[in-house]
Structure formats: C-alpha cells, structure tokens
Amino acid sequence: VIGGDECDINEHRFLAFLYPGRFFCSGTLINQEWVLTVAHCDTISMRIYLGLHTRSVPNDDEEIRYPMEKFKCPNRKRSYIKDKDIMLIRLNRPVNDSPHIAPLSLPSNPPSVGSVCHVMGWGTTSPSKATYPDVPHCANINLVNDTMCHGAYNGLPVTSRKFCAGVLQGGIDTCVGDSGGPLICNGQFQGIVSWGGKVCARLPRPALYTKVFEYLPWIQSIIAGNTTATCPL
C-alpha cells in the first residue's frame, strides 16, 4: 500500500497472507473454512497464513493452511487475465476465532460512490521500487464514480463487476503485492484488490477492484455445495 501506515494489529483479523512462492497476495477470511481473493493470484502451490501481522515474527495464534479446493468463474475468459478476477479457496482445515483471527462478513448492500474505504496489504510501499514491509499497511481512499473510472481506463472493459477507488490528488494506492486484499467501505467488505495503472498512486488512474456484491449469489452457491454455479456475465 502506497501512502499508508502500519495497520493496527487488531484491525485485520480477517486478512490472509497468500504465499504462492515467487510473489505474494492477500485474501479475506469470510468464514472459518473459506478465503476470498482474486483469480490472478492462483498458482499450483500456495500457503495461506492467518493471524499474521509481522511476517518475521509469528503471532502465538497464527495458523497456516493450504487450499483444499479452489473455485474460479467457469465462464471466465481464460485469454483475458483481468476478466472475472475472483477466486474462492476452501481451506484444508477450518480455523477457529482467536485474538488475531476472525472472518469478515460479506456485504449486505452495494457500494456507494464517495464512500470512504479502507484498504490493506503487505504490498510494496514505494511506487518506484519494490519495498515490501514486514507488516501490513492500511490507507483510506474513496470510491470513484464509473464515468471517471471508464475515462481512466479508456479501451479496457471496466464493467459493472469492477469499480475504481483512490484519491484524486494521487499518492495513496494499492500496488504490487496487495492483490486479493479487501477494500472495506463504510464498514462493509465491498472490493477485492484487482489491478491498476502501470505506476501505482499516479493520476489519473485509481486502482480497480472486483465488486464483491455482484458475486454474492456465486459465492453463496459455491459455499453451499453448488460447485457448478456460474458468475454474472
């Protein structure tokens, strides 16, 4: 996260650190057995850390899990990595609530333009060079209207399944290593860090987020056992 500060150790109990090997991502624990992230973070081998704050110093209640099952949209365009950028991971074993682990509820309402949103992750803190912090960083940004979002990504398919968030003056943004992490707007889990401009935190391109609310039927169907459910078009 560019332009943020170290997260409070107690404000990200749902934040998962995904370590696929060559790079890393984040995810969000949505119940004791499921983590929600983005499809472009998928790799063959992956470790999932829960209850993590300082990467070099484990918490007493830190847990490590592995994917038992991974679900991406069956109607996703495989030739276009940014299409339907969402993935559900079923953990090999459930986790229990603890001082540093607790799930985040899915949203009950869609996001609204202008909302103040909170983003977090272990991604680089510098837009010009890879500077990965030992602790997650948090920042506040705003949900941007669709007209501005489409204008920033002219020619790219910015759909109703995505939205933009950032700050108009630049300088605060998600970046490399933050993919898959949550965007929490007005207390609700509304977005998943997906992708952005070639240079983070630079105008006029706020980052793009997968809109969780649009995928609620798919998420709920998969968790309920309907593993052939399709995503919205």
UniProtKB/Swiss-Prot annotation:
Q: How does it assemble?
A: Monomer.
Localization recorded for this chain is: Secreted
- Domain of life, per lineage: Eukaryota
GO MF term (any one) = serine-type endopeptidase activity
Active site: which residues? Answer: H40, D85, S179
Enzyme class, UniProt record, top EC level? hydrolase
Q: List the disulfide bonds.
A: C7-C138, C25-C41, C73-C231, C117-C185, C149-C164, C175-C200
Species of provenance: Bothrops alternatus (Urutu)
Main localization is: secreted
Q: What is this protein called?
A: Snake venom serine protease BthaTL
Record's GO cellular component terms: extracellular region; secretory granule
Q: Which family does it belong to?
A: Belongs to the peptidase S1 family. Snake venom subfamily.
